[in-house]
């Protein structure tokens, strides 16, 4: 059984805490328009893939918290000796430019990010291609 999880906004904060406690319960985690509030070590030790997606000008969080979490996880993987290509299979940082939203008639990156991201074929392909 493959369990994939998505967390959007406050749900992403909550899900990051779950990932920080028991990431082995999930095949992969997609964090949308949120920030990471959980621990990092167990995620790295379990090798559970994580995909961060957020608008570059997200009105609620901004993109910096996602960048910070990605960099922290990336650093921990490097400390374990993983190559960049191995890390790229486990960790994605996808900061969408404003044009991603405006090309779809959207001006509110945070409020509409969740609905756009779950309809984005490349993001969903990443999520559903992950197996354990």
Predicted regions and their residues:
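A conserved short beta-strand
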Residues: 24-36
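Short, small-residue-biased leader/transition segments that mark boundaries at the very start
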Residues: 1-2
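Short alpha-helix in the alpha/beta-hydrolase fold that links the catalytic acid
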Residues: 61-79
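Gly/Ala-rich beta-loop-alpha elbow adjacent to hydrolase catalytic centers
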Residues: 7-11
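Short glycine-enriched nucleophile-adjacent loop
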Residues: 12-23
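Alpha/beta-hydrolase-fold catalytic nucleophile elbow
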Residues: 6, 32-33, 53
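C-terminal catalytic histidine-bearing segment of alpha/beta-hydrolase fold enzymes
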Residues: 53, 59, 76-132
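Short, proline-enriched alpha-helix->beta-strand connector loops that line the catalytic pocket
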Residues: 44-50
